[in-house]
Amino acid sequence: MLLYFEKIQSFTTAHPCENVTVDGAQFRYILNGKTDGKTLVFLNGGMNTLGMWMDYVDGLSDVCRVLLFDYPQELRTNQELVVGMHAFFQKFGIKDPIFIGASDGGMVAQIYTQKYPDEVGGLILISTGGMDANTLKSLKRKYRFAPLMLWYLKRCNYEKMKPKLIKLGMSHIRNESAEEVAYAQDMFDTIFRDYQQEKDVHISGLLADLMNQIPVTASDFAAVQGKILLILPNQDFFSGKMQEDLIKLMHDPKIVYVSGGHLSTVLKADDYVRTIRNFLSEMSE
């Protein structure tokens, strides 16, 4: 198993990022795969790093067009983000995207679907919770100090804080192999080496803003009935109750329970790609 640093170097050489400005927001993105296929849009988790999806690109680009992008720092709220995404998709002629959203990216997918319910081709939600009233209430309790933490993040010595943030990321390890633990450690070390304070402030602001959203309801997802895949680890950051509430929101979802924790999206990417390919094949039947 190659380490993250080695893999991301090869990936960025094979798939260089491009930049485009849409309505004042700069999108850093990779667009690859079948030009005449359905478009899979990958929505990043809490570090807003498109590199988290690198193992998914070659594994899925032969059957679909794939779009990866970082959330633009000009878009400061989740409502601004989904409106900006909509304009971004229109620029490239992307219609009815199938969202693959992990962790907080799964929540962004729900907000987008709530706003544009008839313009979503499917939902693949991984290691995430629902944007329902119960989950938002639980998250508000869990993150009641988020405004204070955000204030501190803007003013702290960020370089000195990085080791603590890496340790926090590694706290999501759950019974992974020694090889997987080493990969995760190298991933966080590599990402944080050049990670900018402004980027962390931006994504942390988006995470805090999740608590300000209007809760979604089951009716928001009626238009994607039968086009929903949920991949739920049994030792995830999101509790079993949150997973149950997510399931209740969805219409006729396919549910795949997997062994692992919150980092399984990256550490078990090959297994997840196979699951996604099977689901896409079933959707096409």
Please provide the spans of the model-predicted regions.
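Conserved HGGG/HGGXW glycine-rich cap/lid loop of the alpha/beta-hydrolase fold
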Residues: 25-75
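Conserved loop-alpha-helix segment in the C-terminal half of the alpha/beta-hydrolase fold
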Residues: 58-59, 223-260
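Active-site loop/oxyanion-hole signature of alpha/beta-hydrolase fold enzymes
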Residues: 67-104
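Conserved alpha/beta-hydrolase catalytic His-Asp/Glu region
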Residues: 134-136, 156-222
